[in-house]
A protein has these predicted regions:
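Terminal connector regions
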Residues: 120-158
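Generic low-polarity alpha-helical segments
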Residues: 31, 114-116, 139-140
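A contiguous, surface-exposed recognition patch within enzymatic or periplasmic domains that forms
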Residues: 1-103, 109
């Protein structure tokens, strides 16, 4: 495969998180680069999906104006892909168990938390296969080959 692909187009993949459990109390997304990893931790009840954008000038509306080219993006969401709130309210993914909107009330305060971390990883660290709690102030990342790295983070803040 090659990227960027077709000029004037954007592609988007929506990945749905599994529900939180006692053993896995958060959902995560990770990207590994040479010597470090960026990862995001979230409550999947608040952000049930993650969008992976492959932007190459396909969004003509402001503020992009088809100038957003050769870019990759990751966005935690509660939405119907990148569609409008009106379309998300139709709850078209309900039969798959994926909420696309959330009700808010002026009388009920809501906090939506997302933790983003950059941490060092050992040489040769590959595709992240798991991020799990390691006590209350750290997480352990495991790659596809069984290599591990620990990152200090108060994941309980989620």
């Amino acid at each position: 495969t090659r990227y960027p692909a077709r000029a004037g187009n954007d592609d988007l993949v929506m990945m749905v998180s599994e529900d939180a459990t006692r053993e896995q109390p958060f959902a995560w997304t990770a990207v590994v680069l040479d010597g470090y990893v960026w990862f995001s931790l979230k409550n999947p009840a608040d952000f049930p999906a993650t969008l992976f954008w492959l932007s190459n000038g396909g969004r003509s509306a402001a503020p992009w104006e088809s100038r957003h080219c050769g870019r990759l993006g990751i966005e935690d969401v509660c939405s119907h892909f990148c569609d409008s709130v009106d379309l998300s309210r139709k709850d078209l993914l309900r039969n798959l168990g994926v909420p696309t909107t959330r009700r808010f009330s002026k009388d009920e305060p809501v906090t939506l938390r997302n933790i983003q971390v950059v941490a060092a990883v050992p040489e040769g660290f590959g595709l992240v296969k798991a991020i799990v709690p390691s006590g209350g102030n750290a997480v352990m990342l495991t790659d596809e080959n069984g290599l591990t790295a620990t990152a200090a983070v108060d994941w309980t803040a989620l």
